[in-house]
């Protein structure tokens, strides 16, 4: 500070004398900055200065305790002692000659070149010794054998076996290695290119070391040569991208050999200096074949490959051991996950990660399809590359390159450039491919082309072109197949797959098993191809090579055994599939009968037509492929929206478990796409579609979708006229509304949902009642299919509803869950009280049509699926219902023992998948295929407004015109993501508070029975809704959009007047949440 001020003072005279003030200003600025820096320095010095104690200890400051004179004396003594010590050292220092001899001083009279040579020799000797030690250090395999490296026992056994096979010959010979490596020089581009990249290090040496050392080498090489040829044979293919299919065939052996090439090349670079030193050292008498040319220019693109000196065999052996060691570790890890992966399609990411780690370089090159082949070793493929390669470390990039048989030398940008093509392929193909392989549902998703569930098959065909075909083709055309698959997949919507993936991964392994069964049922060929098949293919293709490769042989028995197991599993799955198909046929027959009955009843021809199409679709759904055809049905076709299907495909993965379970009837979803009724019919497909952003008619999700999801039967017993109860059964294949025969006919239209065939339900004890109702229903169902689907609006007449609601008031108190255990029959028996689900109907007498809200709780799947349908013919259905009577909605938990048994059977048979949750979109979230059947709020028509019945899942039955329009718009918005995600969507709430929570759909696992208390609260619908949420059970709430219903507090959503209907598709917001529900009041519903 002082100095700077002094400087300033000194500077002033100059500046002032010059009379130039500009420099003065500049100088002031400079000085100011100097002062600042000086301040900082001073601050630092002050902070870092030694304490007085330290200064005292170092003799710099006198201690406070002792007098200053004493301190000075001590200091002088110290100095004297130091001086004496230095003088002594100077006297005893060695002579110059001695220093020269010790190379501390240079000889003035000697030639400088000689000295330099001596120094070089000395350094070279040191380097050579070090190199020798390094070259002869034990490799990881040897360390493992000697128990120096701790490894998993299985890996150790494999390593010991492999090590004995591959490396016995080279392990003992270290002398010739150096020579051969020395002999090799960048001058040998031709030989090295072939060898360096593809050949194992040992071979080049064999051919290129015609040195005296070969005396010992020949024998060694003779023994080594057998392995070398094998390595050389496969590695070239592995290394070269074109033959990648072959490379994939190479199992770990190939990989190891192939990798060694690039790896060796890369590592040889660092070693070059050492090699040079060795040659200079001339410690060996052998003649040098070639001297390294230091001036030779090696272009960067060739550096890692052609003109690099080959690694000495010792180093190569080390590298190979390391690679083998890593591969064996990966293999052991893969084996641990082997079964899980093949069966579990869900965890794509894990698989990919493993793949990326796996040492199958060639396989990776193969393409997403080969990945599966790749998995020959395990069930893995070179994992898909992350979106940004820059984030990867160099070591990770090199690992990826090795997996793909690419050179690993070069800078990070070079590595990234090499990996980019694979990144693109993987991003599109692998995501799709992985999905496809992963699960039929995923495949379905990927297959937008097949609008229906067919996608699975189609995808499958593209991917594997049939199980058998894949097997046959894979070895030769595995790559092409893979490529095709990639192409097919890449266009496919990948986004759904991630959600599916996540949902699947979250599921239990059991779920995965059931899922695989489902997939198999859906299309055995596809399932096979999806995982086991590919494995089989890979292993088959590998087998030829593996026979040649010694390393492969180690795993051959294991692989064979696994393959056999997989084949057995496939056979079992096929048998199950056949059984399921037979069952489907029977159900289809039943459906046919029902359909005919329904057709006969021409209640409102149009509605019936939709219902019919739905039914046919359902049947076809069971068929799977036929579904698509069914979709072609006039109604279906018109209603069918390819987009919905496509979205369904996407969404389907979620439901796939359920849908496929639905008995391959999942495809039914498609059938339900018929436009008018299609909306409802689109059921699952539309449901999913809508979730995917398609605005299927108002149907957000269809009961069927739920049904597909759950084999659980939704029994929405709607008591029509109080006497008849409509039970909606969402059997595996379809959702069915069953109305008691009594009011069945009139109510049936409402129940039109009958369109859903209770395939599973029929099969189960429910079946008997269903048939009766179905016959009556079918007509109505057909006529009303949309309505029914929408809301199973039983008791369409608002008048009826009001009284109904009044009745239910007490009923509501009953746990809306009449214990799922109560059979559907039970619910039928107590139709009037069944209003239990109808929340506080009594409170809402004023609002004539609080639609009855039927909540069917499907405990089966943890996630309830909510579906909203706009029944185009809703008004007609309402009319019918009104004419019929005011049916009392009865919410039955079709959760009787029969149902439990049925679910168990279905799950075992794979018809129903355990909770498979997919969140392709908020809607799909709402109705995670978790086989929870959305409660179809059997909101009977809200008589005043055109029945605004909303399926508990956001099913809103609004006046057809306004509702459908608003529903579509809102659906679009919802699909587009304007709606909060399913988890965020609050139960539909009507600000008029005149809505009743229709019901919760709970996972069968969480029986709503436990929540019967919530039903008791039904008097205050809002409470009910919240309690349900609190229970954490997915709640399907039906919004009856009658603002007339003042009592429905639970619906916070402001509903326009009854006439406007539920324009806000708040109902659309999936009512079903797999788990946490936000406080309804906190959830913003973006429906306008």
From Swiss-Prot:
The modification Phosphothreonine is found at residues 367, 370. GO terms for molecular function: cadherin binding; transcription coactivator activity. Residues 545-601 form a coiled coil. O-glycosylated. One of its GO terms (biological process) is muscle organ development. The N-terminal region is required for nuclear localization and the C-terminal region mediates transcriptional activity. This is Myocardin-related transcription factor B. The lineage of its organism: Eukaryota, Metazoa, Chordata, Craniata, Vertebrata.
């Amino acid at each position: 500070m002082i100095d700077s001020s002094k400087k300033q003072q000194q500077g002033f005279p100059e500046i002032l004398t010059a009379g130039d003030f500009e420099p003065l200003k500049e100088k002031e600025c400079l000085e100011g900055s100097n002062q600042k820096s000086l301040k900082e320095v001073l601050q630092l010095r002050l902070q870092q200065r030694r304490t007085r104690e330290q200064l005292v200890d170092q003799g710099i400051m006198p201690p406070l305790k002792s007098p200053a004179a004493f301190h000075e004396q001590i200091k002088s003594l110290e100095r004297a002692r130091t001086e004496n010590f230095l003088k002594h050292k100077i006297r005893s220092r060695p002579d110059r000659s001695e220093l020269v001899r010790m190379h501390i001083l240079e000889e003035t009279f000697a030639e400088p070149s000689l000295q330099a040579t001596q120094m070089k020799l000395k350094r070279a000797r040191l380097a050579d010794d070090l190199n020798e030690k390094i070259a002869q250090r034990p490799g990881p395999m040897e360390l493992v054998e000697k128990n120096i490296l701790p490894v998993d026992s299985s890996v150790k056994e494999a390593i010991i076996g492999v090590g004995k096979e591959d490396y016995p010959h080279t392990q003992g010979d270290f002398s010739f290695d150096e020579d051969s490596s020395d002999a090799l020089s960048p001058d040998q581009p031709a030989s090295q290119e072939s060898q360096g990249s593809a050949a194992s290090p040992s071979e080049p040496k064999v051919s290129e070391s015609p040195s005296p050392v070969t005396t010992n080498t020949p024998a060694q090489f003779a023994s080594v040569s057998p392995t070398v040829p094998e390595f050389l044979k496969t590695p070239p293919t592995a290394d070269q991208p074109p033959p990648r299919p072959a490379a994939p065939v190479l199992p770990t052996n190939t990989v190891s050999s192939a990798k060694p090439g690039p790896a060796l090349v890369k590592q040889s670079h660092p070693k070059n200096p050492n090699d040079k030193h060795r040659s200079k050292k001339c410690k060996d008498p052998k003649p040098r074949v070639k001297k390294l040319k230091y001036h030779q220019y090696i272009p960067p693109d060739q550096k890692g490959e052609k003109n690099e000196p080959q690694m000495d065999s010792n180093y190569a052996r080390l590298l190979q051991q390391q690679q083998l060691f890593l591969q064996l570790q990966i293999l052991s890890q893969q084996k641990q996950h082997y079964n899980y992966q093949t069966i579990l399609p869900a965890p794509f990411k894990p698989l990919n990660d493993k793949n990326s780690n796996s040492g199958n370089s060639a396989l990776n090159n193969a393409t997403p399809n080969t990945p599966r082949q790749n998995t020959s070793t395990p069930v893995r493929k070179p994992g898909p590359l992350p979106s940004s390669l820059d984030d990867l470390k160099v070591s990770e990039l090199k690992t990826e390159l090795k997996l793909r048989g690419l050179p690993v030398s070069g800078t990070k940008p070079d590595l990234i450039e090499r990996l980019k093509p694979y990144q693109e392929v993987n991003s599109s193909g692998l995501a799709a491919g992985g999905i496809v392989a992963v699960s039929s549902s995923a495949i379905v998703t990927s297959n937008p082309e097949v609008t229906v569930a067919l996608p699975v098959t189609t995808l499958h065909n593209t991917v594997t072109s049939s199980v058998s075909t894949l097997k046959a083709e894979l070895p030769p055309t595995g790559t092409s197949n893979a490529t095709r698959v990639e192409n097919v997949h890449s266009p496919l919507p990948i986004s759904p797959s991630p959600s599916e993936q996540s949902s699947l991964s979250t599921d239990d392994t059991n779920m995965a098993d059931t899922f695989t069964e489902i997939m198999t049922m859906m299309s055995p060929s596809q399932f096979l191809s999806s995982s086991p098949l590919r494995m089989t293919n890979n292993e088959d293709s590998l087998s030829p090579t593996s026979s040649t490769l010694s390393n492969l042989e180690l795993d051959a028995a294991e692989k064979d055994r696994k393959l056999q197991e997989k084949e057995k599993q496939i056979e079992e799955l096929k048998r199950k599939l056949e059984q399921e198909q037979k069952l489907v046929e029977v159900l289809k027959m039943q459906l046919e009968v029902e359909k005919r009955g329904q057709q006969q009843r021409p209640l409102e021809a149009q509605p019936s037509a939709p219902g019919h199409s739905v039914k046919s679709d359902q049947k076809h759904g069971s068929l799977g492929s036929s579904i698509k055809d069914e979709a072609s049905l006039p109604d279906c076709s018109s209603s069918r929206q390819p987009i919905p299907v496509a979205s369904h495909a996407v969404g389907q993965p979620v439901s796939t478990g359920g849908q496929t379970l639905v008995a391959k009837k999942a495809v039914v979803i498609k059938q339900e796409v018929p436009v008018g009724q299609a909306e409802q019919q689109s059921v699952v497909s539309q449901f999913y579609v809508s979730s995917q952003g398609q605005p299927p008619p108002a149907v957000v999700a269809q009961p069927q979708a739920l049904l597909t999801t759950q084999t659980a039967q939704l029994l929405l017993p709607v008591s029509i006229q109080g006497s008849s109860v409509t039970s909606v059964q969402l059997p595996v294949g379809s959702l069915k509304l069953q109305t008691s025969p009594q009011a069945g006919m009139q109510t049936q239209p409402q129940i039109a949902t009958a369109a859903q065939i209770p395939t599973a339900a029929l099969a189960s004890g429910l079946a008997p009642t269903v048939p009766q109702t179905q016959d009556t229903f079918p007509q109505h169902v057909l006529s009303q299919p949309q309505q029914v689907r929408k809301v199973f609006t039983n008791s369409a007449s608002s008048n009826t509803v009001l009284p109904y609601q009044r009745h239910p008031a007490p009923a509501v108190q009953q746990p809306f869950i009449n214990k799922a255990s109560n059979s559907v029959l039970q619910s039928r028996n107590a139709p009037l009280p069944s209003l239990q689900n109808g929340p506080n109907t009594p409170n809402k007498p004023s609002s004539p049509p609080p639609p009855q809200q039927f909540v069917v709780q499907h405990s089966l799947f943890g996630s309830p699926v909510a579906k909203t349908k706009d029944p185009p013919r809703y008004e007609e259905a309402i009319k019918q219902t009104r004419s019929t009577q005011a049916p009392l909605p009865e919410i039955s938990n079709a959760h009787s023992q029969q149902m439990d048994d049925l679910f168990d059977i279905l799950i075992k048979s794979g018809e129903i998948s355990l909770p498979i949750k997919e969140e392709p979109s908020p809607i799909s979230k709402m109705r995670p295929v978790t086989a929870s059947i959305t409660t179809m709020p059997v909101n009977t028509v809200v008589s005043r407004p055109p029945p605004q019945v909303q399926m508990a899942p956001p099913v809103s039955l609004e006046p057809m015109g306004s509702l459908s329009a608003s529903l579509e718009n809102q659906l679009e918005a919802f699909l587009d993501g304007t709606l909060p995600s399913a988890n965020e969507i609050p139960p539909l709430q009507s600000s008029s508070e005149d809505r009743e929570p229709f019901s919760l759909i709970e996972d069968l696992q969480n029986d709503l029975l436990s929540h019967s208390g919530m039903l008791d609260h039904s008097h205050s619908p809002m409470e009910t809704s919240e309690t349900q949420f609190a229970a954490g059970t997915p709640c399907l709430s039906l919004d009856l959009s009658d603002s007339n219903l003042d009592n429905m507090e639970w619906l916070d959503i402001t509903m326009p007047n009854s006439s406007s209907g539920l324009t806000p598709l708040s109902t659309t917001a999936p009512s079903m949440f797999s788990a946490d529900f936000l406080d309804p009041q906190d959830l913003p519903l973006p429906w306008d």
